[in-house]
């Protein structure tokens, strides 16, 4: 009832921001808040473009037990000399942004300026991939995890853990040292599979990759075991120890996250690094498609009525953002959107059928490149110009992070289905490198100018524009 009463004074939108590792969640939140507070030019965000957005400012968040999103620290990273990307999301955090605006509705204007609270909830997308575990027993999860680790795209990364499977007898007495060693091998496999060159996405349990405040906890000290055809195991065995911890993980980690945070969201943006999956080849793209389907199925989506909006909110607007659009020439942005639409197509259709609005955008919350041209032979190529991060490579060239380069990233396929069928492995000239942030521009009045972006205003309009009418 507290949320209900406060909502009568100043409405609140709970905006979920998620995505898999390195997809740009932290940068998106920092850029969104900075642009709104600084009064940036946002032509496709109606309230700002029409001069109705009067002020934006931060306020104390309502959930005092949830860590605050460190906006000031992350902004400091982006405006440092040289600028650097902020650290990735590793746990759930929250930030309250309040907007004061003039309504388009006559009766609201008679009441003076209006206020809208935006409670931004930042959480790792890896945690969403845990929700399907709620319907799996430990035995079912173990069998699934072992089968997945034997797939061609994971086999190499899983080799050390796979080797240890044959050395562990699930009927042996429970041993903490054995459990820790075996769990560490499993976690190492998941981390290897997530990193380049594999760039895989569907790697639960999510807290094994993003432990948050549970790092080192016994709740994260378990791993799949091979039952070896046995139907039951003795009490006090390694199997029953692992099974008990798996069930505790679901009860004390997964369910509270769903109940206390995820189930209360009104709007959602999902950040997806499609280009990283394309770099990883067809297996990584196929795995991203599986992850997108699982993530979208987790959302309690649909249109809201008065009752549901107050007591059982549904996510009625979803933005799927193909991030790092600045790593491509704008001529390929529509193709990037088409690939993401193809990846999430079935799940999008279900959400739209339930009444939710879903929009796909090629986006860069902070634009790290500009566009240019380069000649190769007699051909003029559309390029992007920026500072590749140290260690990034194209062919035999390794960048040091200090030099500006014009790079031709290639063209995405006109048929998005080709991206799911191994197209990238046949086009070796395609390589998407990462760039450092742009140099900040100091303002004479103090502070820094908002960073250039690609379609950030369209994302904001889709997520909250209707609430500012």
Language-model segment annotations:
Residues 321-328, 361-373:
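Short, conserved secondary-structure transition motifs
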């Amino acid at each position: 009832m507290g949320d209900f009463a406060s909502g009568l004074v100043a409405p609140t939108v709970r905006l979920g921001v998620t995505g898999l590792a390195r997809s740009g969640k932290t940068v998106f939140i920092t850029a969104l808040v900075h642009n709104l507070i600084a009064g940036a030019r946002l032509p496709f965000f109606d309230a700002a473009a029409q001069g109705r957005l009067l002020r934006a400012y931060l306020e104390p968040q309502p959930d005092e037990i949830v860590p605050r999103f460190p906006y000031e620290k992350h902004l400091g990273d982006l405006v440092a000399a040289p600028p650097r990307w902020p650290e990735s999301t590793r746990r759930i955090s929250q930030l309250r942004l309040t907007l004061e605006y003039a309504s388009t509705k006559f009766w609201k204007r008679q009441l003076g300026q209006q206020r809208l609270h935006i409670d931004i909830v930042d959480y790792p997308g890896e945690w969403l991939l845990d929700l399907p575990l709620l319907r799996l027993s430990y035995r079912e999860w173990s069998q699934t995890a072992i089968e997945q680790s034997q797939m061609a795209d994971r086999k190499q990364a899983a080799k050390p853990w796979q080797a240890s499977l044959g050395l562990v007898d699930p009927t042996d007495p429970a041993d903490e040292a054995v459990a820790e060693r075996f769990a560490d091998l499993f976690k190492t496999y998941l981390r290897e599979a997530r990193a380049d060159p594999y760039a895989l996405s569907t790697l639960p349990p999510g807290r094994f990759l993003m432990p948050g405040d549970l790092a080192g906890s016994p709740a994260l000290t378990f791993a799949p075991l091979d039952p070896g055809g046995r139907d039951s195991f003795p009490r006090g065995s390694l199997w029953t120890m692992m099974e008990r911890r798996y069930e505790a993980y679901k009860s004390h980690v997964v369910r509270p996250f769903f109940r206390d945070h995820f189930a209360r969201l009104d709007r959602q943006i999902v950040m997806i690094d499609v280009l990283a999956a394309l770099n990883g080849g067809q297996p990584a793209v196929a795995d991203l498609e599986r992850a997108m389907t699982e993530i979208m199925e987790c959302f309690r989506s649909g249109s809201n009525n008065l009752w549901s909006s107050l007591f059982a909110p549904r996510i009625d607007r979803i933005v799927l953002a193909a991030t790092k659009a600045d790593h491509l020439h704008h001529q390929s942005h529509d193709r990037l959107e088409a690939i993401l639409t193809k990846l999430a197509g079935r799940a999008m259709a279900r959400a739209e059928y339930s009444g939710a609005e879903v929009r796909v955008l090629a986006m860069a919350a902070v634009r790290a490149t500009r566009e240019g041209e380069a000649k190769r032979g007699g051909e003029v190529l559309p390029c992007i110009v920026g500072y590749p991060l140290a260690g990034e490579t194209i062919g035999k060239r390794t960048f040091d992070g200090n030099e500006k380069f014009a790079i031709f990233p290639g063209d995405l396929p006109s048929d998005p289905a080709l991206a799911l069928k191994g197209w990238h492995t046949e086009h070796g000239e395609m390589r998407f490198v990462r760039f450092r942030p742009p140099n900040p521009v100091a303002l004479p009045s103090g502070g820094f100018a908002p960073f250039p972006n690609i379609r950030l205003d369209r994302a904001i309009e889709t997520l909250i524009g209707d609430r500012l009418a």
